[in-house]
Amino acid sequence: MGGAVTKSETLQKEWVPETKLEAKIIEAVQRRASRGTTMKSFNSIVLKFPKIDDGLRNCKAIFQEFDEDSNGSIDHTELKNCIRKLEISFDEEEINDLFKACDINEDMGITFTEFIVLLCLVYLLKDDSSTLQKKWTMGMPKLEPTFETLVDTFVFLDENKDGYVSREEMVRAIDESGERSSGRIAMKRFEEMDWDKNGMVNFKEFLFAFTQWVGIDENEEEEEEDNNEKA
């Protein structure tokens, strides 16, 4: 029984989370995966891009609330205050890991795009999302369906429910769309997600790529240029 095991599949089985936070994220994704996914195809995901883009922009008010000095980024102290206000039970190590994980450009500050990723990770890790809804009166009811769509999308791509998306899983998901040159498209999308180039995509990497796919980065740059011209 059983066919040949590919190098990528072997890598998946042996993959070990680097931090306690990453282990928690994988466990949370796997719990969510046990409920299944509503996504039917990669095309159905693409059709949701405009709605997801609109939903993620509701994070702006929350970002501004926790950016206490209004300098355009959330520093480590502001993040600790944010976690405390949201009554999330993260210890010091997990807060440090969360900050380090989301500060992708390593400038010691969480930008708006990075904050979107952070909020979605917190949403995933929070057992009782209704608590978040009560705490985040500024836009959270609108954010919850958007975050759930992002989690649902990752669950759809992660066929074997191990908490990671492999290159083969991405290729199969896009191949099913029936598009011409789907293999090339799948490889490009996977490379955009695989930030550390280790051949596996975790939920955090997926989120960063997704913000780019829906155009968050581009619009943020346009806003910054407009603000600079007005200054």
Curated annotation (Swiss-Prot):
Ca(2+) 3 binds at D194, D196, N198, M200, E205. Keywords: Calcium, Metal-binding, Repeat. Residues 54-89, 90-125, 145-180, 181-216 form the EF-hand domain. The keyword Oxidoreductase does not apply. GO terms for cellular component: cytoplasm. Ca(2+) 1 binds at D67, D69, N71, S73, E78. Transmembrane segments: none annotated. Ca(2+) 2 binds at D158, N160, D162, Y164, E169. GO terms for molecular function: calcium ion binding. Potential calcium sensor. This is Probable calcium-binding protein CML21. It comes from Arabidopsis thaliana. The gene is CML21.
